[in-house]
Curated annotation (Swiss-Prot):
Domain ApaG: 2-126
Matches recorded under Gene3D superfamilies: ApaG domain (2.60.40.1470)
PANTHER family tied to this protein: F-BOX ONLY PROTEIN 3, POLYMERASE DELTA-INTERACTING PROTEIN 2
GO biological process terms held by the UniProt record: error-free translesion synthesis
PROSITE patterns for the chain: APAG
Pfam families (UniProt xref): DUF525
Protein name from the UniProt record: Protein ApaG
InterPro entries: ApaG_domain, ApaG_sf, Uncharacterised_ApaG
Length: 126
């Protein structure tokens, strides 16, 4: 664990995309908007992502790759980077979590944690 691990805060907002979903075919599309806030004193570049996505049946999908939405943004201190992406689940409920592989401007590699967040149809849970 790096001292820089806590220098990045990840905020998430999710939305069910009804018009592009097909419940009769067990296809539920969710978008998620991620805001990555650099609370540190150095710029930090997002190099990789690692997601673990679990649906209500316990089916686990893992997604790893370079950057996010085709970008590897450098986030200056006290600023934020935001993007929107999506995922399709076989069930109306699931969770996602993971990490971003980051590198500071001084070259130190560290992980930014993406805490678990829920993907759910509106009104499904109270």
């Amino acid at each position: 664990m790096s001292a820089l691990d806590d220098s990045i805060r990840v905020e998430v907002k999710t939305e069910y995309i009804e018009q592009q979903s097909s419940p009769e075919d067990q296809k539920y599309l969710f978008s998620y908007t991620i805001t990555i806030v650099n609370l540190g004193e150095q710029a930090a570049k997002l190099e990789t992502r690692h997601w673990i996505i679990t649906d209500a049946n316990g089916k686990i999908s893992e997604v790893q790759g370079a950057g996010v939405v085709g970008e590897t943004p450098t986030i200056p201190p006290n600023t934020a980077y935001q993007y929107t992406s999506g995922t399709v689940l076989d069930t109306p409920l699931g969770i996602m979590y993971g990490t971003y592989g980051m590198v500071s401007e001084s070259g130190e590699r560290f992980k930014a944690t993406i805490k678990p967040f829920r993907l759910a149809l509106p009104g499904l849970l109270h």
